[in-house]
Amino acid sequence: MDPSQNPNIVHATTIISVRRGGHVAVAGDGQVTLGHTVMKGNARKVRRLGREGQVLAGFAGAAADAFTLFELFEAKLDKHGQLTRAAVELAKDWRTERRLGKLEALLAVADKETSLIISGTGDVIEPEDGIIAIGSGGSYALSAARALLAHTELDAKTIATEAINIAGDICIYTNRNVVVEEL
């Protein structure tokens, strides 16, 4: 949903996950927008999950739905202990439990080996190039990350940070207050 379509929903952000040199970084901006108004500039939308913080996760979308999706995924991760298995089990729940309905949110999750997008409709998608970019500035961040990967020797954390900064310069729903985690 375009952030401007419903001015009463808190949403819009940019999250990116980048892999390089055996490392993965997930970065996100800090802006929370309600309709056309910036409500907060320093939100933390990227976190470590799992027993030992072995999974990185970032969320984009309607805030309440994103927190619900986070909680559901984290419960599956705690139960199964493995990223792909937790994502698949969460997707199975969508097919069997009507109460989950449709959440207007996306998660970008990554561990040392795998990167996945988990949608609020129960879809699990693994990107073919190891880059995930979601949210209102996702296209800008994805373009920046691909260019930096192809034409520089920068590490994953630096590329993720710069991709969010570039998106923040272009997308009105994204700022340059970057939070980044790396494995």
UniProtKB/Swiss-Prot annotation:
Q: Main role?
A: Protease subunit of a proteasome-like degradation complex believed to be a general protein degrading machinery.
Q: Name one GO molecular function term.
A: metal ion binding
Claim: Cell membrane is one of the keywords in the record: no
- List the keywords (alphabetical): Allosteric enzyme, Cytoplasm, Hydrolase, Metal-binding, Protease, Sodium, Threonine protease
Q: Which family does it belong to?
A: Belongs to the peptidase T1B family. HslV subfamily.
Q: How does it assemble?
A: A double ring-shaped homohexamer of HslV is capped on each side by a ring-shaped HslU homohexamer. The assembly of the HslU/HslV complex is dependent on binding of ATP.
Task: Provide the catalytic activity annotation.
Answer: ATP-dependent cleavage of peptide bonds with broad specificity
- Organism annotation: Xanthomonas euvesicatoria pv. vesicatoria (strain 85-10) (Xanthomonas campestris pv. vesicatoria)
Give residues annotated as binding Na(+). Answer: 168, 171, 174
User: Where do the catalytic residues lie?
Assistant: 13
What the record says about activity regulation is:
Allosterically activated by HslU binding.
Q: What is its EC number?
A: 3.4.25.2
Gene it is expressed from: hslV
Q: What class of enzyme is it?
A: hydrolase
* One cellular component term from this protein's GO annotations in UniProt: HslUV protease complex
Enumerate the Gene Ontology biological process terms: proteolysis involved in protein catabolic process
Output the superkingdom of the source species.
Answer: Bacteria
| Residue stretches in coiled coil | none
- InterPro entries recorded: ATP-dep_Prtase_HsIV_su, Ntn_hydrolases_N, Proteasome_sua/b, Proteasome_suB-type
Q: What is this protein called?
A: ATP-dependent protease subunit HslV
Subcellular localization(s) per the UniProt record: Cytoplasm
